[in-house]
């Protein structure tokens, strides 16, 4: 059996090709069922996200040719269309690649945690369709353990490297608990949606979404349990917010110094955090001059993100060392299983010979043959039976001119330590 990983990702393939090779939920079921019945595949998992499509399998052959042909045929493409963008790994390299993917080291955003959840979901899907067994299943179990170790022993996921996540991290640094805060989100685009998701994950449960059109904001409100207001209503609600995060496409500022002064007064000077992600700015720069106000712009966030990227690179080096160690340990353990099977088979072989010879000897004694004669015959036959296979192997190695093989057999049998 050979562990094999092949696929395409954001580094090797265009969006157009990634779309063609992606597996929808319906396609995933069909694909896993095909692989389960494939004569050369014993176990398989498919990881398909917006940035990658990868097939992990345990196969009866080496080399990726059969799997490349299957992947192309399944998506009604020619092998030539996908071959330039494909990468593949075997055995320890395949194990190492999977661990790197699950730990976020192969992601567009270094160290991003979402990929681990996606890999786990792929594993559960493969389980559901009874497509994963044996060695591959053990590899995925090991990978999840390694990912946990990497998250625990390194800071690969501890530093924000996206604007949305950096905004939430900043809020968490200033306010001890986000569950006790009210957050006003200005805008309802993709960035604000990501901010909302991060805030809810961090325990925030009081969201107000202000947007030019309430229909768009209503979608966020439904998903995250937020209150919806229009942009003109911001002045009357601003004092309720401990945190304001803004990202609109407005050409002019939406929140002015005077508006914030009134809000601070109504709050009896309890501090407010403003995170202005918009370009041009949504919050007047003069707001930052007010007491009890913390104002951060997108430039401030970018400097934080750049610093965090460098810290993640250091953590990534530590993570790579862990993965190299763990992938080597996994393959060593896997090879030891092969030795265990061989030892068990050899013991069974020897036991069968022993039991057969013993049965014959006892029967001979019962039939009146002298015990001394039976013992001599037993020892001779037992010796001949046990040395037959290694004797043939040495003769064959000598006949074929294979001195290395002959040397291994001699070492295995301990012949080099016997003095003439």
Curated annotation (Swiss-Prot):
Superkingdom: Bacteria
Keywords associated with the record: NADP, Oxidoreductase, Porphyrin biosynthesis
Residues the entry annotates as binding substrate: 49-52, 107, 112-114, 118
Site feature Important for activity, where: 97
Positions of NADP(+) binding: 187-192
The protein's annotated pathway: Porphyrin-containing compound metabolism; protoporphyrin-IX biosynthesis; 5-aminolevulinate from L-glutamyl-tRNA(Glu): step 1/2
Active-site residue numbers: 50 (nucleophile)
EC number: 1.2.1.70
Transmembrane segments: none
Record GO terms (molecular function): glutamyl-tRNA reductase activity; NADP binding
Gene Ontology BP terms: protoporphyrinogen IX biosynthetic process from glutamate
Catalyses which reaction(s): (S)-4-amino-5-oxopentanoate + tRNA(Glu) + NADP(+) = L-glutamyl-tRNA(Glu) + NADPH + H(+)
Family classification: Belongs to the glutamyl-tRNA reductase family.
Record note on quaternary structure: Homodimer.
Note: During catalysis, the active site Cys acts as a nucleophile attacking the alpha-carbonyl group of tRNA-bound glutamate with the formation of a thioester intermediate between enzyme and glutamate, and the concomitant release of tRNA(Glu). The thioester intermediate is finally reduced by direct hydride transfer from NADPH, to form the product GSA.
Role description: Catalyzes the NADPH-dependent reduction of glutamyl-tRNA(Glu) to glutamate 1-semialdehyde (GSA).
Domain note: Possesses an unusual extended V-shaped dimeric structure with each monomer consisting of three distinct domains arranged along a curved 'spinal' alpha-helix. The N-terminal catalytic domain specifically recognizes the glutamate moiety of the substrate. The second domain is the NADPH-binding domain, and the third C-terminal domain is responsible for dimerization.
Name under which the protein is recorded: Glutamyl-tRNA reductase
Organism field: Photobacterium profundum (strain SS9)
């Amino acid at each position: 059996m050979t562990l094999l990983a092949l696929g395409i990702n954001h580094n090797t393939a265009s969006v157009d090709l990634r779309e063609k090779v992606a597996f929808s939920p319906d396609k995933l079921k069909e694909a896993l069922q095909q692989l389960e019945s494939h004569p050369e595949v014993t176990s398989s998992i498919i990881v398909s996200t917006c940035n990658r499509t990868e097939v992990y399998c345990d196969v009866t052959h080496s080399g990726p040719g059969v799997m490349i042909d299957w992947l192309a045929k399944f998506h009604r493409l020619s092998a030539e269309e996908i071959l330039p963008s494909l990468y593949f790994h075997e055995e320890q390299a395949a194990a190492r690649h999977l661990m790197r993917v699950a730990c976020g080291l192969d992601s567009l955003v270094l160290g991003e945690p979402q990929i681990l959840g996606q890999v786990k979901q792929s594993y559960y899907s493969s389980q559901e369709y009874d497509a994963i067994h044996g060695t591959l299943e053990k590899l995925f179990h090991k990978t999840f353990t390694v990912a946990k170790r990497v998250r625990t022993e390194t800071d690969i996921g501890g530093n924000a490297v996206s604007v949305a996540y950096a905004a939430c991290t900043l809020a968490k640094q200033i306010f001890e608990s986000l569950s006790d805060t009210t957050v006003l989100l200005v805008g309802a685009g993709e960035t604000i949606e990501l901010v909302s998701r991060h805030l809810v994950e961090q325990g925030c449960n009081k969201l107000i979404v202000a947007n030019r059109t309430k229909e768009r904001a209503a979608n966020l409100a439904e998903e995250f349990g937020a209150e919806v207001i229009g942009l003109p209503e911001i002045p009357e609600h601003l004092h309720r917010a401990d945190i304001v995060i803004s990202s609109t496409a407005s050409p002019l500022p939406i929140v002015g110094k005077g508006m914030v002064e009134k809000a601070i007064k109504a709050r009896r000077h309890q501090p407010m955090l403003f995170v202005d992600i918009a370009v041009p700015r949504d919050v007047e720069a003069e707001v930052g001059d007010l007491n009890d106000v913390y104002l951060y712009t997108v430039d401030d966030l970018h400097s934080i993100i750049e610093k965090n990227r460098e810290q993640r690179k250091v953590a990534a080096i530590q993570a790579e060392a862990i993965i190299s160690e763990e992938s080597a340990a996994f393959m060593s353990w896997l090879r030891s299983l092969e030795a265990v099977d061989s030892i068990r088979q050899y013991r069974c072989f020897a036991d069968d010979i022993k039991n057969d010879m013993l049965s014959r000897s006892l029967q001979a004694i019962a039939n009146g043959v002298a015990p001394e004669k039976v013992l001599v015959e037993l020892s001779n036959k037992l010796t001949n039976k046990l040395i037959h296979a290694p004797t043939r192997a040495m003769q064959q190695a000598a006949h074929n001119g294979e001195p290395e093989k002959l040397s291994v057999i001699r070492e295995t049998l301990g012949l080099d330590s016997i003095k003439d």
